[in-house]
Amino acid sequence: MPLKKLKPVDPLKLYSALRDFGMPFMLRSAEKDSRKARFTYISAEPEFVVEVGEGTEIDGERVSDERNPLRALKGLMGERVEGRRFMGGFVGYVSYDSVHSIIGGKIEEPSVFGYYPWTFIYDHSTGALSFFYLREAPFDPEALVERARREESRLEDGGSEVISTDAGMEEFVEIVRAGKEYIYSGDVFQVVLSREYRVRTDLDALEIYKRLVELNPSPYTFILEFEKTVVGASPETMGSVEGRTFKINPIAGTAPRGRTGEEDRELEKALLSDEKERAEHVMLVDLARNDVRRVSKPGSVRLTRFFDVLKYSHVQHIESEVVGELDEGKNAFDAMEAAFPAGTLTGAPKIRAMEIIDELERSRRKVYGGAVGYFSLTGDADMAIAIRMAEIEGRKASVRAGAGIVADSVPEKEFFETENKMRAVLKALGVRE
């Protein structure tokens, strides 16, 4: 297996050196139970690009009518290598909008993946940098490393301003009340409703990424500079597959951070004793169990963590972990299809919740609420939920957040939850509070 050891270099500088090439990406993932990065994957110049919207295209040419991105990718992954985690393969995003392949309706925001049979792999625990390649890459990895080692770190100036929102406080309170009516009538137990800020920015995408990682260290951080750029620091996996193990970590239940250690602990205690938050979390753990069970061996599904509190820069969340062993004939694409869309971004039951989201939200979700990550040539996969992120096109960015609505939700409180969730991303964009 072609794996070249290279002189170590700061991954941010290496990514910066690679930006002259097409469709660069940087994915950073943490070890289980830690937000400290374990591996960073960096590459560019995919061999081909898959776009799935109202059909599947490869490099701009329509190849099928398949609208489900996970099924489309499954049919295109022909190569396999021995190893673990990411060693080349598909990197990109599944747009939330592709739920219309499940519930009907037009897909307006395509899912996009590049196929990268070459990638830099940086191991944060050892400081080792290596370059995996199935074929000769369209760039010289050693020359890029040398260039990166000479790169000067610099802070970019610039900022952003909010230009509009699809739902201010009054409108969002109305949306939440309408969602609660569907809960009272028995359509759903919970529905996740979101709102968006549109922002004008003159900040470089890599600077936004650097600021966001510093402000909000998270298990998953990413920058993908495709035709659309996505930059994010997500706390939550939609699903991961390592070997034959399929894992979902549902996060549900949110409280703000305290200004002091004592206030923070009080808010954590209140969060864990809040009946509404507990009920919401248990509901979504059950949903994750069902998703994992759909593709796992009978009797292999288990709950390995329950009601842990994880703390981020502006919020703290309750998290659990559901694990199963993939059934015979099932692979990472089947696992992610079972998980998509994440129940923590729709509510339960999923299908009816998605229909209500379509009806009540004031604008389409685009990539937000979908997933960002990789499908490796090793058979492993890791997809973060596309939240705590900015979607950037030219000088315009959109930032979105949602809140889980249940029968006793207080609409005004849910509005402030969306504000708290967006705060770190807006701050990274340079929007003044």
UniProtKB/Swiss-Prot annotation:
<comment type="subunit">
    <text>Heterotetramer consisting of two non-identical subunits: a beta subunit (TrpG) and a large alpha subunit (TrpE).</text>
</comment>
<dbReference type="GO" id="GO:0000162">
    <property type="term" value="P:L-tryptophan biosynthetic process"/>
</dbReference>
<dbReference type="GO" id="GO:0004049">
    <property type="term" value="F:anthranilate synthase activity"/>
</dbReference>
<dbReference type="InterPro" id="IPR015890">
    <property type="entry name" value="Chorismate_C"/>
</dbReference>
<feature type="binding site">
    <location>
        <begin position="219"/>
        <end position="221"/>
    </location>
    <ligand>
        <name>L-tryptophan</name>
    </ligand>
</feature>
<keyword id="KW-0822">Tryptophan biosynthesis</keyword>
<feature type="binding site">
    <location>
        <position position="280"/>
    </location>
    <ligand>
        <name>Mg(2+)</name>
    </ligand>
</feature>
<keyword id="KW-0479">Metal-binding</keyword>
<dbReference type="InterPro" id="IPR006805">
    <property type="entry name" value="Anth_synth_I_N"/>
</dbReference>
<keyword id="KW-0028">Amino-acid biosynthesis</keyword>
<feature type="binding site">
    <location>
        <position position="404"/>
    </location>
    <ligand>
        <name>chorismate</name>
    </ligand>
</feature>
<keyword id="KW-0456">Lyase</keyword>
<protein>
    <recommendedName>
        <fullName>Anthranilate synthase component 1</fullName>
        <ecNumber>4.1.3.27</ecNumber>
    </recommendedName>
</protein>
<dbReference type="InterPro" id="IPR005801">
    <property type="entry name" value="ADC_synthase"/>
</dbReference>
<dbReference type="Pfam" id="PF00425">
    <property type="entry name" value="Chorismate_bind"/>
</dbReference>
<keyword id="KW-0460">Magnesium</keyword>
<dbReference type="InterPro" id="IPR019999">
    <property type="entry name" value="Anth_synth_I-like"/>
</dbReference>
<feature type="binding site">
    <location>
        <begin position="402"/>
        <end position="404"/>
    </location>
    <ligand>
        <name>chorismate</name>
    </ligand>
</feature>
<comment type="similarity">
    <text>Belongs to the anthranilate synthase component I family.</text>
</comment>
<dbReference type="InterPro" id="IPR010116">
    <property type="entry name" value="Anthranilate_synth_I_arc_typ"/>
</dbReference>
<feature type="binding site">
    <location>
        <position position="368"/>
    </location>
    <ligand>
        <name>chorismate</name>
    </ligand>
</feature>
<dbReference type="GO" id="GO:0046872">
    <property type="term" value="F:metal ion binding"/>
</dbReference>
<comment type="function">
    <text>Part of a heterotetrameric complex that catalyzes the two-step biosynthesis of anthranilate, an intermediate in the biosynthesis of L-tryptophan. In the first step, the glutamine-binding beta subunit (TrpG) of anthranilate synthase (AS) provides the glutamine amidotransferase activity which generates ammonia as a substrate that, along with chorismate, is used in the second step, catalyzed by the large alpha subunit of AS (TrpE) to produce anthranilate. In the absence of TrpG, TrpE can synthesize anthranilate directly from chorismate and high concentrations of ammonia.</text>
</comment>
<comment type="pathway">
    <text>Amino-acid biosynthesis; L-tryptophan biosynthesis; L-tryptophan from chorismate: step 1/5.</text>
</comment>
<dbReference type="Pfam" id="PF04715">
    <property type="entry name" value="Anth_synt_I_N"/>
</dbReference>
<feature type="binding site">
    <location>
        <position position="417"/>
    </location>
    <ligand>
        <name>Mg(2+)</name>
    </ligand>
</feature>
<feature type="binding site">
    <location>
        <position position="388"/>
    </location>
    <ligand>
        <name>chorismate</name>
    </ligand>
</feature>
<keyword id="KW-0057">Aromatic amino acid biosynthesis</keyword>
<feature type="binding site">
    <location>
        <position position="29"/>
    </location>
    <ligand>
        <name>L-tryptophan</name>
    </ligand>
</feature>
<feature type="binding site">
    <location>
        <begin position="253"/>
        <end position="254"/>
    </location>
    <ligand>
        <name>chorismate</name>
    </ligand>
</feature>
